[in-house]
Amino acid sequence: MFKKILVTIACVSLMAFAAEDPVAAIQKKDAELQTLLKKSSRNSKEAERVKNLLNDSFDFALLAKKSLSANDWKAQDAASQDKFVNEFQRMVRNSSAKRLELYRADSTIYEPAKMKGDNEARVVAHLWNKGKESVLEYKMSLVDGKWKAWDLVIDDLSTARNYKEQFSQILKNKSFAELIDIISKKADETEK
């Protein structure tokens, strides 16, 4: 009886481990997204599903942290960091949900994941839409047993680097609290 329990636990553990392939994680989310994009118009329920897909796919806390210089991040107390992460997530999620046509693809080919240790991976996807290729690179981390992207590089343009440059410019003239207000207003604008 004890052996059967051990074998069952081992099988479940192996299945869970096998399910955590970073390429498979991206393919699954991409398939859901492509299904939603094929619809000519999306109702509010489907728009919310897109936002939930983004929440499930991205590590917004790490993306937010990497969107600031190490010094700017460390200079903030935990409450300010949390508020920044929450508003940043809202802004990125809302603006990404509005610009989804960029991710529409007739076909997609995924390269094998490039692993860095057991908890970091890079997955490159080649998307073709109407004969034009776009290359997306997902920089990923294993978070609570799930692969999540913390940066998306589209045709050599890094999301994290782009935000870092923008926020660095803003913080030259404004306080961190003012940066959070700017991000919050942008999130409100894109929510409509």
State what each model feature region is.
Residues S40, K114, V153-D156:
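Short loop or secondary-structure boundary microenvironments that flank
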Residues K4-S13:
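Sec-dependent N-terminal signal peptides
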Residues D151-K192:
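Low-complexity, intrinsically disordered terminal/linker segments enriched in charged
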Residues E133-R161:
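Short beta-strand edge/turn micro-motifs at domain boundaries
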Residues N94-S134, K186-K192:
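Surface-exposed, charged secondary-structure patches
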Residues E20-R99:
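Early exported N-terminus immediately downstream of N-terminal targeting peptides
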Residues K65-A70, E101-S107, Q169-L171:
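Juxtamembrane/interface motifs at transmembrane-helix termini
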